[in-house]
Amino acid sequence: MILYEYPFNERIRTLLRLEDLFERFTFFLTQEDAREHHVALTTLFEIAEVAGRADLKSDLMKELERQRQTLAPFRGNPGIEQNALEAVLGEMEQTLAGLTQMQGKTGQHLADNEWLASIRSRAIIPGGTCKFDLPSYYAWQQTHPDQRRQDIAKWIMPLLPLRDAAAIVLRLARESGQASKVMAMQGSYQQMLSGRTYQLMQVRVAPELRVIPEASANKYMLWVRFTVQDGDLRPRAVDVDVPFQLTLCSL
């Protein structure tokens, strides 16, 4: 099944963006070629941009603390797997400690590094990081891959508590939902939300159907409409029934 996810609020939207960026960063950092490490570095700049939202750190700390207080009373409950519970609580407490230790403005260490700041300013220009534009950057790209990885890992380290916190919140949200099999009649589906507040919607479709879901929602109702791509990859509305799995997630 192909999984599509749709955030219901700006906070989850930001966390999904961070998750995607960190996954891309990790992939390219593990590669060998200097061009791949260039992508890792520019992705690091994107992470800092998204993570620099003023209230992101405090939002994550509040959510983790709320979840910790919800789970902590289950300690000693014979109906709960205690090892799993302690692992989750320990992960939360460790991540909260990491967030607490973050000092100053998020990503400020990148702005304070003049060399990185020069690369960042040139990277937004198409073709702006050529060797004649940034000879010192080109020289760094000629160093051993292990050295480049070590440098980039050092630059990402102050942002890792945000990655860990986002991963916990998204995991808890995803695990809260229960998938149900539904049918989009003539490619369209809608459902009343009965006043419940959700943070995330998941849509799973069989790859052989070759359909793409488009979703929208408000606090009363959600809509899912399916399209297919024509020869030019432009979306075209589906007029046949489409089976899919729907999961609504609420923290």
From Swiss-Prot:
Family annotation (InterPro entries): ZapD (IPR009777), ZapD_C (IPR027462), ZapD_sf (IPR036268)
Subcellular location: Cytoplasm
Pfam families with a match to the protein in the record: ZapD
GO BP: division septum assembly; FtsZ-dependent cytokinesis
UniProt GO cellular component terms: cell division site; cytoplasm
Chief localization: cytoplasm
Swiss-Prot/TrEMBL keywords: Cell cycle, Cell division, Cytoplasm, Septation
Quaternary structure (record): Interacts with FtsZ.
Record-stated family: Belongs to the ZapD family.
PANTHER family: CELL DIVISION PROTEIN ZAPD (PTHR39455:SF1)
NCBIfam families on file: PRK05287.1-4
Function, in words: Cell division factor that enhances FtsZ-ring assembly. Directly interacts with FtsZ and promotes bundling of FtsZ protofilaments, with a reduction in FtsZ GTPase activity.
Protein name: Cell division protein ZapD
Natural source organism: Paraburkholderia phymatum (strain DSM 17167 / CIP 108236 / LMG 21445 / STM815)
